[in-house]
């Protein structure tokens, strides 16, 4: 009897003399969730591209259902029931949800009614409410992820690989996804789960394999290890303090004040303040209005009413340029689209928010000063790059995020807003980014952090504001931090606020 759906034996892969994989062993069993863990650059995605038929290994064997197999392209893998859902989604933005789900069956299945009916059935199974006739390009990133999963479920799958599936999902949607994964596991599907969120990995996985520098560190049963053991395997050392000590910071006078803010449909009568040296979190479900609040404060979306004040002075923000001039910076949730110019050098990205500091009186660039400033920034942020002339696209996710942070360190404003600051970042880089965020507060900045990772909010923030349906429903402090309290406030609002936190 075959006990493994897939067995990757002694897999090696080189790209131009660089060893991406070195004799890696990995297997997938029916009815099991096998987590694949490691820092960015460890080789996880490369190994899954081998399983998905996207790349051919330099050495080693791919065994599917007990038979040695050559997977020459993704079609070979799909024919064997292997589907890989990548972090970078492969959808056609100008086609409808239904057309994307059944793209492989077009044009043979041309009835729009049939397409949409079948698509709705799949989406309903996933527990989401998405119009199958809507263009994919108009969906949120979270709902695009749902479409990608529905597309996989439309096929007769034996193995499904999830690469960072909850990176763009809030807690509620992540719970729905985990229910789906458990259902697939119960049907005998083999599941590979890649994630940097170790708490959810321990919740969903039966086994874990850790990779480092293109090699297998080890495979363990989830019940046999603790999170600290996995971190040590991943980074080669224990991370004693993932989050910095709050006691090292001095909280001063109020810097940012937002009063009765209304913007579009998603920001309704929002009021709060952030003081110098303070880190305030903004929590809630996806679609609660958190990102929209950030965009309104940054001048990216127009206000319908309300005031934004900095150091007691009301601001008139008609654009992000106005916000930057006033001293407000934003690290957006999608760093590749809005945080950096991905193909430009590190030095250009790091100085673009305050070019005036590296040009002369005539407006010409002073290259020596630019290099000096960016080199110093890179050292202070522990940026790992071959050169400050390297394009941002050549960096890992964690180092790309450091470049976005470098931009605002260089700009020197008073208020920094960070939207999902560690999305897609490995555990070692997370600890470094947390330290950098804390450094901003130590330097007297007012810091607003938006995150779908509750432990991130609780570990970093002095206070956490709970948002729901475009409103701030309440506030939590360290004495009553818990996921139950945050979700309770976000979903139920004032009815439970007296028991769980302060009303704002």
From Swiss-Prot:
It is a peripheral membrane protein. Its EC number is 7.5.2.7. ATP binds at residues 38-45. GO terms for molecular function: ABC-type D-ribose transporter activity; ATP binding; ATP hydrolysis activity. The keyword Iron does not apply. Gene3D superfamilies: P-loop containing nucleotide triphosphate hydrolases. Residues 6-238, 251-494 form the ABC transporter domain. Its main location: membrane. Pfam families: ABC_tran. It catalyses: D-ribose(out) + ATP + H2O = D-ribose(in) + ADP + phosphate + H(+). SUPFAM superfamilies: P-loop containing nucleoside triphosphate hydrolases. Keywords: ATP-binding, Cell inner membrane, Cell membrane, Membrane, Nucleotide-binding, Plasmid, Repeat, Sugar transport, Translocase, Transport. GO terms for cellular component: plasma membrane. It is found in: Cell inner membrane. PROSITE patterns: ABC_TRANSPORTER_1, ABC_TRANSPORTER_2, RBSA. CDD domains: ABC_Carb_Monos_I, ABC_Carb_Monos_II. It is an enzyme of class 7 (translocase). The complex is composed of an ATP-binding protein (RbsA), two transmembrane proteins (RbsC) and a solute-binding protein (RbsB). Belongs to the ABC transporter superfamily. Ribose importer (TC 3.A.1.2.1) family. Part of the ABC transporter complex RbsABC involved in ribose import. Responsible for energy coupling to the transport system. This is Ribose import ATP-binding protein RbsA 3.
